[in-house]
Amino acid sequence: YIDPHYGVIVEDGGEVLPDGVTDNHQATKYQKRVTELKNLEASNRLFIELVEELHRRGMKIILDGVFNHCGSFNKWMDRERIYENQKDYQPGAYISPDSPYRSYFHFLKDDEEEWPYNPNYDGWWGHDTLPKLNYEDSVKLENYILYIGRKWVSPPFNVDGWRLDVAADLGQTNDYNHSFWKKFREAVKDANPNALILAEHYGDPSEWLQGDEWDTVMNYDAFMEPVTWFLTGMEKHSDEHMEDL
């Protein structure tokens, strides 16, 4: 679904966090907004209207597909405990060992006594706010992401393609990575042959650009890096600060 904060809030309720409180488990207003089905469905309808208007004006729209990892607030993990007490949602993998999403993640400590609230999972680059998705151990997860790839480029949404976040990092091995993107391309192009598959990638992307995976890549090496250096005198990811700029 489209986040209602960017879409439509039909039903509101709950309370904002008090000053000084950072526990999202108490963010009842946020919880009400993002778990209420009426808000989610209304937001999707608004998105359909947005895409129709963009196309009427001769414009295209692509979505950012973050399929290597999710956020700690995602209902699959629910480390922020947003969905824990919502009656229409199953427990996240952080909450319960019986979560239907447990296999979506690799838990470094997976004995039953580590739950509830098991923080010992693989995060992308070690970030616990970015739980890495565990495709190799979950056919269900793979099939769901392929479904997502098809869904948004198909009617009634009719998005014009995908931008794939850290696409080369997906999966645990290079072999699986290529296998997945071939399946993803087949799913997307079957739904919408004109959909663009644009990957975020640093370095040589040639092994993914053989006609059966990505269409193209974001041109970091030949555009963003030199332009950043020209404008700032620093590499794009530098933490340095130049006082004369």
Task: Give the predicted meaning of each segment.
Residues 1-245:
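Active-site and adjacent substrate-binding regions of carbohydrate-active enzymes
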